[in-house]
Amino acid sequence: MTKFLDETNIIDYSNQEIQKLAMNLSTDCKTDIEIAKKCFEYVRDNINHSGDYKDNTTTCKASDVLKYKTGWCYAKSHLLASLLRANNIPTGFCYQRLSCSEYKDDIYCLHGLNAIYLKEYGWYKVDARGNKEGVNAQFNPPIEKLAFELEENEFDLPEIYEEPLEVVVQTLEKYKTYEEMINNFPDIELAKTDNKNEETNNLP
């Protein structure tokens, strides 16, 4: 579980501004649930989703997401993890493979979100990508209310990762404009669906 509290180059929660915000958000909170809710709602509501705003600033490191107040779903998950880990709440990274037809026809890509370890409930998934018409992600454990319901040919990656996927980090660091990003969203091999089914079939 300690690996879900680690600081990394991307989850750089020793940054002074992240530390300050993490402390402010946890003020007067009595439980990890209260802290997690405040951190989640801050990132969801106060950091622009780069795709929704067609922002040409692509961020990756948590401190940059906070500095520029913008990020794709992946980057927003990096900031949320930093705020929670700074408050000693284990946090991991989760992904879905979704249709990205709102940006380009007939493409699929990874969507990034978080899993938070809550003392009362265990792992709980949240999606801080930002709400808009048709998207209403909430924090109400143990009920998970994510941004998107899975449709045909979409799936969850079953793992909870300690660090962001390398393909996600590489994409965010390489492509900097809105147009570059929508033409190069991070994705995985379709064979992943077969692995997912194998893992599911092997569950006790």
Label for each model-derived stretch:
Residues 9, 15, 24, 46-48, ...:
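Detector for Asparagine
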Residues 44, 61-65, 69, 102-106, ...:
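Charge-rich, low-complexity amphipathic helices
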Residues 40, 72, 93, 173-176:
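Intrinsically disordered, low-complexity segments enriched in small/polar residues
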Residues 41, 75-165:
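Hydrophobic/aromatic-rich core segments of domains that either
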Residues 136-204:
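A structured, mid-to-C-terminal "fold-capping" secondary-structure block
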Residues 1-68:
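Secondary-structure boundary elements
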Residues 64-65, 72-78:
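Hydrophobic/aromatic-rich structural module bridging two neighboring secondary-structure elements via a short loop
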